[in-house]
């Protein structure tokens, strides 16, 4: 006999007395205790202690029946002991009306469910449908067909309207595109025409510029040559006027020829001269008054005009400039009128009518302008006649007539003193 381990037995007793495992079968309890390493004697002792010493024979029989497999393999198991008598079966419970009611309702529900299932799912598959059902199905199908047909008709109408709108829009777009193309072509043509006209204008401007430059150069050359000649003449006149004749004896002037006298007469009759009156007096006296023996030399007898009566170079240049500008403007105005007359004669008629009206409105101003032009022409003639006259070297220093005669002749000619005429010219 092996010794019983108290610690293991007490732990097994505590395990068996646990209320949580009280309802579990005894065989499982014994298997669990044996799995913890307890032997058969310790298991029996634990079972006895857990039951408080009662039923030792039953415990022993249970322990022997649930012994481990090792002991069973070595020793044949003993059959369980037969009980002393058989117990009677317990009587059947009595059934109340409630039980019958529950059974009736359950059978009624089950039977109704079976009927519905069979009538709805089984019989339609087994038996053909009735005529009423077929007619109802036909009516439903006809209604669906009519609804679908109406939907198709509305869809076709909407589609046709949409197609018409798209066609109208496409037509409008094509019209706008054609208009845009026409506008673009017109603008391109206008741009080309403008470019060509600009080119022509540039060429015309260049040609006008070249002609103007040439005219200006030619005018400059002519003006410079004329100014040179005028300056030379002025220098000669100043030298003759400023020269002092006191140092030289006065020689008798030779008789003027007929040509010089004619030239001087034409210069006198042509109008107011462009040079001072005092410079033309010696020539006239030379022709009209022959030299006499009574005339003596001296500053009192000489006719020397004052320096203020001689026109300055600035005045002469201004006159020449105004004259060239007037001639140039008149020539350009005539060219412009000819070009306008070729292009648009109505403008020329309007311009001439306007000019006639202006001439009627301002006749006095036109007369003044004509007088000025005549005076300028007379001055030009006088200058040309002076150039044609050849002055003798010392005959111009001959005695001049008395101042009374000079003033009387000048007043009889124009009514204005000679120095005023020289200043005005």
UniProtKB/Swiss-Prot annotation:
The keyword Phosphoprotein applies. Phosphorylated on serine or threonine residues. One of its GO terms (biological process) is protein import into peroxisome matrix, docking. Pfam families: Pex14_N (PF04695). It comes from the Eukaryota. Residues 56-76 have a biased composition (Low complexity). Keywords: Membrane, Peroxisome, Phosphoprotein, Protein transport, Translocation, Transport. GO terms for molecular function: signaling receptor binding. Gene3D superfamilies: Winged helix-like DNA-binding domain superfamily/Winged helix DNA-binding domain (1.10.10.10). InterPro entries: PEX14, Pex14_N, WH-like_DNA-bd_sf. Residues 256-297 have a biased composition (Polar residues). Disulfide bonds: none annotated. Residues 315-324, 333-366 have a biased composition (Basic and acidic residues). It is found in: Peroxisome membrane. A motif (SH3-binding) lies at residues 89-97. GO terms for cellular component: peroxisomal importomer complex; peroxisomal membrane. It is a peripheral membrane protein. Residues 49-89, 247-425 are annotated as: Disordered. Component of the PEX13-PEX14 docking complex, a translocon channel that specifically mediates the import of peroxisomal cargo proteins bound to PEX5 or PEX20 receptors. The PEX13-PEX14 docking complex forms a large import pore which can be opened to a diameter of about 9 nm. Mechanistically, PEX5 (or PEX20) receptor along with cargo proteins associates with the PEX14 subunit of the PEX13-PEX14 docking complex in the cytosol, leading to the insertion of the receptor into the organelle membrane with the concomitant translocation of the cargo into the peroxisome matrix. Interacts with PEX13 (via SH3 domain); forming the PEX13-PEX14 docking complex. Interacts with PEX5 (via WxxxF/Y motifs). Interacts with PEX20 (via WxxxF/Y motifs). Interacts with PEX3, PEX7, PEX8 and PEX17. Belongs to the peroxin-14 family. This is Peroxisomal membrane protein PEX14. It comes from Komagataella pastoris (Yeast). The lineage of its organism: Eukaryota, Fungi, Dikarya, Ascomycota, Saccharomycotina.
